From Swiss-Prot:
Name of protein: Protein transport protein Sec23A
PANTHER family hit by this protein: PROTEIN TRANSPORT PROTEIN SEC23, PROTEIN TRANSPORT PROTEIN SEC23A
Gene Ontology terms: cellular component: COPII vesicle coat; cytosol; endoplasmic reticulum exit site; endoplasmic reticulum membrane
Bilayer topology term: Peripheral membrane protein
Species of provenance: Xenopus tropicalis
Free-text comment on this protein's domains from its UniProt entry: The Gelsolin-like repeat mediates interaction with proteins containing PPP motifs.
Gene3D superfamilies (UniProt xref): beta-sandwich domain of Sec23/24 (2.60.40.1670), Sec23/Sec24 helical domain (1.20.120.730), Severin (3.40.20.10), von Willebrand factor, type A domain (3.40.50.410), Zn-finger domain of Sec23/24 (2.30.30.380)
Gene name, Swiss-Prot/TrEMBL: sec23a
Single Gene Ontology BP annotation: COPII-coated vesicle cargo loading
Sequence positions that bind Zn(2+): C61, C66, C85, C88
Family according to the record: Belongs to the SEC23/SEC24 family. SEC23 subfamily.
Length: 765
């Protein structure tokens, strides 16, 4: 008999789905009392090397309001060649190609191990990939040179049929013609003027191709008139390499005390307009590289006077950031247009100051694009991160997909409240859409323009079954996730995942429901909800909401005597949940203190799309200890773990930090590692470096690497993350285990838990 933990892990490995509850309360009333909603973390394109795509199309339910896909939960009559849909109970005839099926000869989609299955759509043209580079030239020469080298590297990784285009901008915006032999030719636009898609189309002499007008992507065989600006790599490889080589810093002079005039908003608008009228509904990627904030035209985020700093959180709270609303509105409109056409917008921002990611965040967030933030294009952090965008799988195809749509179907006791992640609503109403919206709701279909094997959405459901209509014993609820997308090979594919979970009466089987709680998934699902609210609500209000939910969960599932905090006990399935909430409250996703608006936008962007494992690391970083006392071991994220004779390795997802304890640091300064008789010390110093490198090699975006020691200025990154169990207030306690006291007024986990227990058991609550 597998345990719930094994069941949860097997389901995640097979289907890329983790539910907050794995047994569902059978009535609306009981479900609301569970505090944490029935919800799922879904990784639609989770890598399954053991799941080859099937070279035929899915069989659909014939009822027009259902159209669910044939799956292992359907009942099949092999003699009559009929199948009953498990969502609407419609009886359907199998198509003629299934004439040979029998109980001994079943198609893959009816086998339980294929609860997730991928189909290749045979009809329709195969589309080339499209990459449009949008490059800021207002930057230092070394930065521009490094960026040009990275772009040339990326060109060498593109398939020969991929179409590429180039737009450069500074004070003016240049759209480069790529079909000209031996001559550089570009269309120049003023950067301080906003243009509609129609105006851009007319100025560039682009007429919509007939295929584009029908809403279908143009076919590869008949390139549309846009081929002056978007050309196959194989035709213009040399031309484009030469053109990039000749790119110079923006020639307009920058007076003393001024910022360069940078037209980022106009450039992005032209890029969106160009793709919109030439390749609608086709996988395309706008890759925008910026070295500073937009200082003129639509989407400007700061004036050109250097003495006026770019907005801070303090300015925004005091309503003293005059460009924020207008700029955000401009970028939101562009994000909406790009998403409607199925195009992805990436933003690679490298500068020492803020560049306007707060205002631009909707572009990558709504289109499934990447957001990368660094200090300079001339760092390994940017170069390696950018190279990882073009990672390939075993078949040498990019691990990126385009033009995804996710459709969800549910059995009649469930409705869909909404989704949170890098998606936009397709406004598809249906019988399974709930009126109570969570995140992007009011629909059962979402568009995910850019999607990779780690892209993860949080989907929230509502149990709608009435209290007085019990579900028969052994009844199961089902959900089907249907993801259609353009594979990087050009094929259209459909990934179908169908799952079922048992219903239980919460009045008689509350233990079964409690035992099915997945505290890791629930913590991340509630965290996504909190971060989503933090985008529009006041910080303290979000923390209060989070605390209230935690107290209610403790009251519902804790064991205690009224008004006796000491008696409070949580079962194993809930025991880690309060600690996740403690670290979430202190995280940069909810605390903006000490972070710029751009940094907060960057952190939240990654949190809203990563899978469960990476999200947990972001909420509660992992700490490993290395010492002479034994092999490396995970230790508590606590100040008591900081000991003089230890090396610590901390992984926060965004940073990899190596910290040498006081004694270790002194030995290193004395040079013991260079003496042959202390070779074991040299190995000890090297071990965390090797482990850190392993993480650095595989993660996207590449983390910042921090090497520090006791008393070092960078040690603050570690001290701000650990639970301050020892502070300057209690460091002289009697008989305490030695650890590093932390100078903070933050509450420790112990105080937090004591307070939580007190509130949970209070009869006044």
């Amino acid at each position: 008999m597998t345990t719930f933990l094994e069941f949860i892990q097997q389901n995640e490995d097979r289907d890329g789905v983790r539910f907050s509850w794995n047994v569902w309360p059978s009535s609306r009333l009981e479900a609301t009392r569970m505090v944490v909603p029935v919800a799922a973390l879904l990784t639609p394109l989770k890598e399954r090397p053991d799941l080859p795509p099937i070279q035929y199309e899915p069989v659909l339910c014939s009822r027009t309001t259902c159209r669910a896909v044939l799956n292992p939960l359907c009942q099949v009559d092999y003699r009559a060649k009929l199948w009953a849909c498990n969502f609407c109970y419609q009886r359907n005839q199998f198509p003629p190609t299934y004439a040979g099926i029998s109980e001994m000869n079943q198609p893959a989609e009816l086998l339980p191990q294929f609860s997730s299955i991928e189909y290749v759509v045979q009809r329709g043209p195969q589309m080339p990939l499209i990459f449009l580079y949008v490059v800021d030239t207002c930057m230092e020469d070394e930065d521009l040179q490094a960026l040009k080298e990275s772009m040339q590297m990326s060109l060498s990784l593109l398939p020969p049929t991929a179409l590429v285009g180039l737009i450069t901008f500074g004070r003016m915006v240049h759209v480069h013609e790529l079909g000209c032999e031996g001559i550089s030719k570009s269309y120049v636009f003023r950067g301080n003027k906003d243009l509609t898609g129609k105006q851009i189309q007319e100025m560039l002499s682009l007429t919509k191709s007939p295929a584009a007008q029908q809403g279908r992507g143009p076919q590869v065989q008949q390139p549309p008139p846009s081929n002056r600006f978007l050309q196959p790599v194989q035709n213009i490889d040399m031309n484009l390499t030469d053109l990039l080589g000749e790119l110079q810093r923006d020639p307009w002079p920058v007076p003393q005390g001024k910022r360069p005039l940078r037209s980022s908003g106009a450039a992005l608008s032209i890029a969106v307009g160009l793709l919109e009228c030439t390749f609608p509904n086709t996988g395309a990627r706008i890759m925008m590289f910026i070295g500073g904030p937009a200082t003129q035209g639509p989407g400007m985020v700061v004036g050109d006077e250097l003495k006026t700093p770019i907005r801070s959180w303090h300015d925004i709270e005091k309503d003293n950031a005059k460009y924020v609303k207008k700029a955000t509105k401009h970028y939101e409109a562009l994000a909406h247009r790009a998403a409607a056409s199925g195009h992805v917008i990436d933003i690679y921002a490298c500068a020492l100051d803020q560049t306007g990611l707060l205002e631009m965040k909707c572009c990558p967030n709504n289109t499934g694009g990447y957001m990368v933030m660094g200090d300079s294009f001339n760092t390994s952090l940017f170069k390696q991160t950018f190279q990882r965008v073009f990672t390939k799988d075993a078949q040498s195809n990019f691990k990126m997909a385009f033009g995804g749509t996710l459709e969800i179907k549910t059995s009649r006791e469930l409705k869909i409240s909404g989704a949170i992640g890098p998606c936009v609503s397709l406004n598809a109403k249906g019988p399974c859409v709930s009126e109570n919206e969570i995140g992007t709701g009011g629909t059962c279909q979402w568009k995910i323009c850019g999607i990779n094997p780690f892209t993860t959405l949080a989907v929230y459901f509502e149990v709608v079954n009435q209290h007085n209509a019990p579900i028969p014993q052994g009844g199961r609820g089902a959900i089907q996730f249907v993801t259609q997308y353009q594979h990087s090979s050009g094929q259209r594919r459909i990934r179908v995942t169908t799952i079922a979970r048992n219903w239980a009466d919460a009045q008689t089987q509350i233990q079964n429901i409690a035992a099915s709680f997945d505290q890791e998934a629930a913590a991340i699902l509630m965290a996504r909800l909190a971060v989503y609210r933090a985008e529009t609500e006041e910080g303290p209000d979000v923390l209060r909401w989070l605390d209230r939910q935690l107290i209610r969960l403790c009251q519902k599932f804790g064991e205690y005597h009224k008004d006796d905090p000491v008696s409070f006990k949580f079962s194993e399935t809930f025991s880690l949940y309060p600690q996740f909430m403690f670290h979430l409250r202190r995280s940069p996703f909810l605390q903006v203190f000490n972070n710029s608006p751009d940094e907060s936008s960057y952190y939240r962007h990654h949190f809203m799309r990563q899978d469960l494992t990476q999200s947990l690391i972001m909420v509660q970083p992992i700490l490993y200890a290395y010492s002479f006392n034994g092999p490396p071991e995970p230790v508590l994220l606590d100040s008591s773990s900081i000991l003089p004779d230890r090396i610590l390795l901390m992984d926060t997802f965004f940073q990899i930090l190596i910290y040498l304890g006081e004694t270790i640091a002194q030995w290193k300064k004395a040079g013991y590692q260079d003496m042959p008789e202390y070779e074991n010390f040299r190995h000890l110093l090297q071990a965390p470096v090797d482990d850190g490198q392993e993480i650095l090699q595989s993660r996207f975006p590449m983390p910042r690497y921090i090497d520090t020691e006791h008393g070092g200025s960078q040690a603050r990154f570690l001290l701000s993350k650990v639970n301050p169990s020892q502070t300057h207030n209690n460091m002289y306690g009697w008989g305490q285990e030695s650890g590093a006291p932390i100078l903070t007024d933050d509450v420790s986990l112990q105080v937090f838990m004591d307070h939580l227990k007190k509130l949970a058991v209070s009869s006044a609550a």
